[in-house]
């Protein structure tokens, strides 16, 4: 249906389709994005707008990270104290009603998008602990959590419930197996972060890889989100690698590799939701992921390439130029008046020289300041220079040594 909508043309008050034959299918079955509303509340109107816009590019999953240390953002009628302002440490009193959640599920379905609600457990749960004065892994905590899962499963007419399980010390070995079984008995499939609880095939329905340490397991479908975080506050930090990299280093999805979800983690507080979109360069990054997850293929993986462009005499560079031109067209015509800070970078060229030794003297000058050359002779040693393309020039990427810098 999204392909048909993409082909639809409008003339005056009429809509029409051109006569054509299309052979097209997705390389990966999951192509999504995640919002961390547990840390920072985002209005329902903004969420719907983003889902609507991105669904036009065949993004088919919205991952809704609803709970965090800072707040429990989903209304509970059985435990309304969870939503009390005094139990939220950021944006107190802001949460989504159960009816709003149901409406968003219906909104997503109309756009062929699957909503995945996440209730993070047993970690990232300080709001829960503050409310009930007990850990989720305690007997009391599990009793409360099961009642909350009854409410969540009844509210969300969706196939999956995400239970987190990341970044936590497990003190109750029965907690995760018992919660997975309980939610499955409600007719839901269960997703869990990896690294997190260790599962064998059949013990979980899907994992989501959040760290470079995350590994897909045979018999358990995996979502690759390992380097798909975009909260780096630099519009050029991620896009080239997102576009070029193969998803989990695979050309196509299979039984064990389901696809990818790009994540905005609101660790830093931004009160303006448009600022969240702009500073994370959401739309441009999502178009890169949308194309790669639909078409498949790519070149290498994030950890073996920089965020710079390939040389301009390569087919990879030519493909990115084509993508960039189409993306900038959509910036003007589809995302009109939306925060879309990306600008053309295929015309950005640098000449980078090897480092000259200043021996701590910041006032010292060197030959490149006077003349641009391919190499320089300085105090009997030759220093080379090279041409680099693109705006993602890093001495050290925000991922640290996991991603090569421009000299890598």
Task: Name the predicted role of every residue range.
Residues 33, 38, 67-71, 120-124, ...:
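Active-site beta-loop-alpha junctions enriched in small/polar residues
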Residues 130-206, 211-215:
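Active-site neighborhood of glycoside hydrolase catalytic domains
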Residues 203, 211-351:
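Flexible, acidic glycine-rich loops studded with aromatic residues
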Residues 366-407:
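Tryptophan-rich substrate-binding surfaces of secreted polymer-degrading and adhesive proteins
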Residues 31-35, 62-64, 115-119, 161-163, ...:
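Hydrophobic faces of well-ordered beta-strands that scaffold small-molecule active sites
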Residues 1-142, 146-160, 178, 182, ...:
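Feature activates predominantly on carbohydrate-active enzymes
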Residues 352-361:
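Predominantly extracellular/luminal regions of secreted and cell-surface proteins
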Residues 1-26, 153, 190-197, 201-205, ...:
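Acidic, contiguous N-terminal accessory segments
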């Amino acid at each position: 249906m999204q392909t048909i909508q993409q082909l639809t043309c409008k003339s005056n008050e009429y809509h029409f389709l051109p006569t054509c034959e299309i052979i097209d299918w997705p390389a990966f079955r999951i192509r999504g994005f995640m919002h961390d509303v547990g840390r920072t509340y985002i209005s329902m109107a903004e969420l719907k707008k983003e889902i609507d816009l991105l669904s036009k590019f065949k993004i088919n999953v919205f991952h809704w990270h609803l709970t965090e240390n800072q707040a429990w953002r989903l209304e509970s009628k059985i435990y309304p104290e969870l939503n009390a302002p005094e139990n939220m440490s950021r944006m107190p009193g802001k949460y989504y009603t159960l009816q709003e959640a149901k409406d968003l599920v219906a909104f997503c379905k109309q756009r062929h998008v699957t909503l995945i609600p996440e209730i993070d457990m047993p970690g990232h749960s300080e709001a829960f602990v503050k409310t009930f004065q007990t850990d989720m892994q305690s007997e009391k905590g599990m009793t409360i959590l099961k009642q909350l899962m009854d409410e969540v499963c009844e509210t969300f007419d969706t196939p999956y419930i995400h239970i987190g399980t990341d970044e936590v010390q497990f003190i109750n070995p029965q907690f995760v197996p018992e919660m997975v079984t309980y939610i499955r008995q409600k007719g839901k499939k269960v997703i869990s972060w990896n690294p997190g609880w260790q599962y064998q095939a059949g013990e979980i329905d899907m994992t989501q890889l959040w760290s470079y340490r995350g590994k897909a397991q045979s018999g358990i479908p995996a979502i690759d989100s390992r380097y798909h975080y975009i909260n780096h506050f630099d519009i050029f930090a991620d896009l080239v690698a997102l576009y070029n990299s193969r998803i989990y280093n695979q050309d196509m999805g299979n039984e064990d590799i389901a696809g990818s979800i790009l994540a905005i983690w609101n660790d830093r507080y931004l009160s303006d939701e448009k600022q969240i979109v702009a500073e994370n360069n959401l739309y441009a990054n999502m178009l890169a992921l949308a194309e790669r997850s639909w078409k498949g293929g790519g070149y290498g993986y994030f950890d073996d390439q920089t965020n710079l462009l390939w040389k301009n005499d390569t087919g990879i560079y030519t493909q990115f130029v084509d993508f960039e031109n189409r993306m900038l067209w959509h910036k003007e015509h589809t995302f009109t008046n939306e925060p879309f800070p990306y600008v053309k970078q295929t015309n950005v060229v640098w000449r980078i020289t090897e480092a000259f030794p200043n021996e701590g003297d910041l006032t010292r000058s060197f030959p490149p300041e006077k003349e641009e050359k391919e190499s320089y002779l300085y105090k009997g040693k030759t220093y080379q220079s090279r041409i680099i393309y693109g705006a993602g020039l890093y001495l050290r990427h925000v991922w640290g040594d996991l991603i090569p810098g421009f000299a890598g």
